[in-house]
Regions:
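Histidine/acidic-residue-rich, glycine-tolerant segments that coordinate divalent metal ions
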Residues: 86-98, 104-105, 122-210
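Acidic/His- and Gly-rich active-site-bordering loop/insert found
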Residues: 1-99, 108-125
Length: 210
């Protein structure tokens, strides 16, 4: 499956889409998953996301594997054949779009996982739910999206998911290895606002200002 995984990753890298705008990305994923045996595919979920369920041949828990599928408004400065060719409107401006956070890899990795596990369905214990989440970078202003909207639309229900593993690459992990732990594993960011009431001062006495 490695050649396919590389090809998928390069495809997504070349044609990235911003949060809640992953129309072609979601369709590409869903169309592929529908070709696999033993998978129940739901699309669209949370506008552009995809959910696929694999019921294993042995008893066990219901777990979910999740990958994010959106890109960022970033210009790619790398001369590679599959560099991003996409520009779009973002906050009223024309911007370039790039998979600068690895979501192209995460998506390809989860597609490859779905292919392998669906082929060995009889040996899989429990049920696997594959979650391809849009808008991980944050839904546009005044729009719903991301994990909250997927949950709201029942992505973790029917079957009821007992645990979720987020798929993420790491340049510090040797090829052929995986890392996992209970609870949080990698950092994320929170948004907050600081209001500062300034006080002017002379340039020769900056310590007097705020």
């Amino acid at each position: 499956v490695e050649p396919e995984l590389i090809a998928w990753r390069r495809h997504f890298h070349e044609f990235p889409e911003l949060s809640n705008r992953e129309v072609n990305t979601g369709k590409y994923i869903a169309d592929f998953l529908k070709t696999l045996p033993n998978l129940e595919v739901r699309y669209p979920v949370a506008k552009t996301g995809v959910v696929a369920v694999l019921k294993g041949g042995k008893p066990g828990a219901v777990i979910a594997l999740r990958a994010d599928i959106d890109a960022l408004p970033v210009y790619e400065r790398v001369a590679i054949p599959f560099a991003s060719k996409v520009t779009t409107e973002f906050n009223g401006q024309k911007v370039s779009v790039m998979h600068a956070c690895g979501h192209d890899s995460h998506t390809a990795m989860l597609m490859a996982t779905a292919k392998m596990l669906s082929a060995m369905q009889k040996e899989v214990p429990g049920t696997i739910v594959f979650l391809f989440q849009p808008a991980e970078e944050g839904a546009p202003e005044n729009e719903e999206g991301g994990a909250q909207l997927m949950i709201k639309e029942g992505a973790l229900d029917n079957p009821k998911v007992e645990a979720v593993f987020g798929i993420h690459i790491s340049s510090q992990t040797p090829v052929g290895n995986i890392k996992y732990k209970s609870g949080a594993f990698m950092a994320s960011s929170d948004w907050f606002t600081i209001k500062v009431n300034g006080k002017g001062s002379h340039g020769s006495q900056p310590w007097g200002g705020v």
